[in-house]
């Protein structure tokens, strides 16, 4: 399993690649989900907030969970806490759109999987009085503590 740890504020951020292409079935399912979306502040979010429960994403969820356990083991080192996935959704952000700054106060770990990132323009920014930008690549996982405000910009 290949990944790197990037420390900001000095909080480590876990970045790893999916390590494979998205299957045609997964892409088709994402395209279908893109037809059931609603407006967010400046982009769109899927109506379904449990997409990883769909059978088509079973393999993806398993791969994600493997990295989630690794993050928990290496970064948090919580001995008596077993992480689990509560919600999962898709955000659709076009050129000149962004994903608003937010946090996930009801979670301990949050993550983003980039399905189609433009490394020249796309970035995730983390805020804590100052901010840190990370340029994602397509198929990157990015896990962070849920208390960190973050937004996606291009």
Pin down the residues of each PLM region:
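Non-heme Fe(II)/2-oxoglutarate
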Residues: 1-81
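Catalytic core of non-heme Fe(II) oxygenases with the double-stranded beta-helix
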Residues: 91-154
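A short glycine-rich, His/Asp/Glu-containing loop-to-beta-strand
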Residues: 83-91
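A residue-level signal for beta-strand positions that form part of recognition/binding surfaces
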Residues: 13, 87, 123
């Amino acid at each position: 399993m290949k990944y790197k740890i990037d420390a900001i504020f000095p909080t480590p951020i876990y970045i790893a690649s999916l390590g494979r292409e998205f299957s045609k079935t997964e892409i088709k399912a994402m395209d279908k989900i893109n037809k059931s979306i609603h407006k967010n502040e400046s982009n769109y979010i899927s109506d379904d907030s449990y997409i990883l429960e769909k059978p088509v994403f079973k393999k993806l969820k398993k791969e994600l969970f493997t990295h989630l356990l690794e993050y928990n083991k290496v970064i948090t080192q919580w001995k008596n806490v077993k992480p689990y996935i509560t919600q999962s959704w898709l955000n659709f952000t076009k050129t000149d759109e962004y994903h608003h700054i937010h946090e996930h106060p009801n979670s301990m770990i949050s993550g983003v999987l980039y399905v189609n990132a433009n490394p020249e323009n796309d970035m995730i920014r983390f805020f804590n009085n100052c901010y840190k930008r990370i340029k994602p690549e397509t198929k990157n996982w990015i896990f962070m503590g849920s208390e960190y405000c973050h937004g996606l910009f291009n």
